[in-house]
Amino acid sequence: MRLSAFIAALLMMFALAPAQAVPKDWNRVVAATPAGGYLIGNPAAPVKVVEYFSLTCPHCRHFVETGLAPLRGNYIAKGKVSLELRNFVLNGPDLSASILMTCGSPALAVHLYDAVYADQEKLFAGAFSLKQDALDRIQAAPLEAKPGVFAHEAGIDAWFAAHGLPPKQAAACLADPKRQQRLIDLRAEAIEKQNVQGTPTFVVNGTAVSGTGWEDLEPAIKTALGGG
């Protein structure tokens, strides 16, 4: 057999071999939701988890550090569970940071969610120790400009710029009163519809979970999947 014929035969064998299906990692699927959140995972997942979070919340950071990896690896990746992230603003630094987190694409928002908790103490260190002259500038700013002035004085805008959010885009979002109001409305809706009182609050298929940790959330997920 000629070499050219041999190579052609080999290529034909590869062409006829059944393709090995690569399992889809649903963690790569991110979309904005009508409720104002960000959905990670299979939109048709049988179990839907909603997390109400605050970017300044240490208990939220603890969940991210201890529970997010198993949630993503064992449940979201396989299409069994989806996770919707919804902001629940608690304070001024949180409002400024939440405006910036939600300023770009859904994928960027999820990236920033992860990044904030990985660097939470450093990010907000200046926000809670502002000097009087900085506080005076914030106080003197018009109401709609306060989140932007606060972000600048506390270095929050610089942190987000270093993590992928273009400064001009950030400035436009901080100055947009509709974005500010939407986050305030999200908080009000969470209180009214789900009786959210603090963060993190988890809701599994419409039912609130008692507790704030992975040790509380995973049993609720297993029960919803039929294995609890």
Where are these regions (language model features)?
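Alpha-helix boundary/interfacial micro-motifs
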Residues: A15-L16, L71-G73, K78, S96, ...
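C-terminal cap of thioredoxin/glutaredoxin-like
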Residues: L3-A5, A21-P23, S54, K146-G228
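Extracytoplasmic/periplasmic, Sec-exported soluble proteins
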Residues: G41-A44, H59-F63, F88-G92, M101-G104, ...
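Tryptophan-centered motif/residue detector
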Residues: D25-N27, L123, W214
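Extracytoplasmic thiol/disulfide redox context detector
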Residues: R2-L95, R187-A188, E192-K193, G226-G228
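Structural alpha/beta surface segment adjacent to cysteine/selenocysteine redox centers
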Residues: L55, H62-P147, E153
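A short hydrophobic/aromatic micro-motif that marks alpha-helical segments and, especially, helix-coil
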Residues: A17, Q120-L123, Q181-R182
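Functionally engaged cysteine thiol sites
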Residues: D25-N27, C103, C173
